[in-house]
Amino acid sequence: MRTRHTTYQGAAMKLGVFLVLFGDMPFEKALDTAKSFGLDAVEIGVGNYPGSSHCDTGALLKSPAKLKAFSDAVRSRGLEISALSCHGNPLHPDPKLAAAHRKTQRNAILLAEKLGLDTIVTFSGCPGDGPKASGPNWVTCPWP
């Protein structure tokens, strides 16, 4: 399928997919699938609620060779990474969960820097409704 571009107010818009949708596929097969649909970009889940089935941030941050192979897998298909995704709750009233989500967000920021990306998709977080809260206080609806 040929890559197509949509325009909005005269500017070209690239089309992409949240690669987590193909989380049951190996990374390279998921990239091939995205490319076969004529897409230009992928948003990659790097932990927290989206999971990290295609991206081990710890390994990529520690190994320049693994980071290069990861980046090359995307670029060799004519795709680009539009964003890293790490939706979580760094303000969760459970201190262990909040700390884990903050660590994932921090690693996403460090990985984005190494990949030359300027976009990370995340949640700001939602605290509990008081000092003894055990869960976040979602005012309008629960998620996830």
Spans of model-derived segments:
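Glycine-rich, proline-tolerant flexible connector loops at the mouths of alpha/beta enzymes
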Residues: 45-71, 125-131
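Transmembrane beta-strand segments of Gram-negative outer membrane beta-barrel proteins
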Residues: 13-15, 79
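Active-site beta-loop-alpha junctions enriched in small/polar residues
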Residues: 18-22, 45-49, 86-89, 125-127
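A short, Lys/Arg-enriched amphipathic alpha-helix followed by its capping loop at the start of a domain
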Residues: 15, 33-39
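Conserved beta-strand positions in the central sheet of alpha/beta enzyme cores
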Residues: 43, 83-85, 121
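Short, Lys/Arg-enriched N-terminal segments with co-localized hydrophobic residues
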Residues: 4-12
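Active-site acidic/histidine proton-transfer and metal-coordination neighborhood
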Residues: 28-29, 33, 68-69, 73-80, ...
